[in-house]
Amino acid sequence: MFSKDIGIDLGTANTLVYMRGKGIIIREPSVVAVDVKMDRVRYVGQEAKDVIGRTPGSIVAVRPLKDGVIADFDMTTSMLQEFIRKALKGRAFAGSRVRVIICIPSGVTAVERRAVKEATQNAGAKRVSIIEEPMAAAIGAGLPVADPTGSMIVDIGGGTSEVAVISLGGIVTSRSCLLYTSDAADEARSV
């Protein structure tokens, strides 16, 4: 039995996986390619993105997250399972003590929060902790989140953008919006 600590930034456009002592070890698109005839996942992440348009019509690309939350529970679970497997370098992780801390947008509903936790557990994590994205971004940026001073963080993601003020170890206020995201910016540039 061994224990692995993994941090996951589950994003609409990309998913990042961090492993304690190694840093960010996976940075891949949040895409799953599914063989609809066989009803099974064929490719995940960069592999799935690379095969878009190069496969028979029976293989369809799916983005399992929309606007920062789970849109397809089963596909999200499959994607997380593959990313955890890659993080552990293919070793079987059944019986291992994989502990995952995973980010969620601020302001998600209790149902959306529970869906993320359950998808992560179904993917093989034995223990799941949830942190709001602005807090994770502030900690990652080295901001003094525990100090009695306000720190503002702006996190522009693929599906949601968030602004938060953090002080004394908590989020004082936050707003999440869908108006300006990297997906929206890419779409505007292509017009």
Where are these regions (language model features)?
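Nucleotide/phosphate-binding catalytic cleft detector across ATP-hydrolyzing
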Residues: 1-158, 164-182, 189-190
